[in-house]
């Protein structure tokens, strides 16, 4: 995530503009997102590391797991949106997303559905990453905190996408 994000946060904010947002699994899922500055820092660390080029994969994130409910509340507040979070069971959200995707495919021009199964998966199930190996082998250190990243994203969103 970060300024210019076109993937997750803009879609979430588009739904949130209605004043309501479906809080899948009551927002209890814990996720660990990655600011674009940290992706760049990890790439630089990998290029400069003495680690052998053996094709290893490394987990990269901000290293700050947070419950979805808290992440959304912070994001909406920073973006100046008053949003009521409405708890929705996961299975109901998955089913509704499938219907939303089907209806979008049937519409002329196939507009993007407001709710997708991928989006439900992102906020409905815990997804955290252990960045220990990247820290130890590459010297990776996140350079942008979650708080700073959210603030930067919100400022950009308010001036460019809102």
Where are these regions (language model features)?
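Substrate-positioning beta->alpha
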Residues: 5-11, 25-47, 55-56
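Mid/C-terminal beta-alpha module of Rossmann-like enzyme folds, strongest
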Residues: 46-113, 151-152
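Non-catalytic, hydrophobic alpha-helical segments
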Residues: 39, 43, 60, 71, ...
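Residue-level signal for the nucleotide or nucleotide-sugar donor/cofactor binding architecture
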Residues: 31-37, 63-66, 129, 144
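Glycine-rich Rossmann NAD(P)(H)-binding loop
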Residues: 2, 24-29, 56-65, 76-79, ...
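Amphipathic terminal alpha-helices
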Residues: 129-137, 141-162
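C-terminal beta-strand-loop-alpha-helix "lid" module of Rossmann-like NAD(P)-dependent dehydrogenases
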Residues: 12-17
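Conserved C-terminal active-site "lid" loop/helix of NAD(P)H-dependent oxidoreductases
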Residues: 36, 96-141
């Amino acid at each position: 995530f970060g300024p210019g994000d076109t993937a997750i946060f803009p879609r979430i904010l588009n739904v949130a503009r209605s004043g309501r947002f479906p809080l899948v699994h009551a927002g209890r899922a814990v996720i660990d997102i990655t600011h674009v500055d940290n992706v760049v820092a990890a790439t630089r660390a990998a290029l400069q590391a003495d680690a052998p080029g053996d094709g290893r994969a490394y987990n990269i994130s901000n290293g700050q797991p947070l419950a979805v409910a808290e992440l959304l509340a912070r994001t909406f507040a920073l973006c100046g949106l008053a949003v009521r979070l409405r708890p929705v069971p996961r299975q109901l959200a998955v089913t509704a997303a499938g219907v939303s995707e089907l209806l979008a495919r049937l519409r002329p021009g196939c507009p993007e559905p407001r709710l997708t199964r991928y989006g439900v998966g992102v906020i409905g199930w815990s997804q955290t990453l252990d960045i220990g190996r990247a820290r130890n082998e590459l010297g990776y250190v996140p350079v942008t905190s979650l708080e700073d990243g959210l603030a930067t994203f919100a400022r950009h969103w308010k001036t460019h996408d809102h």
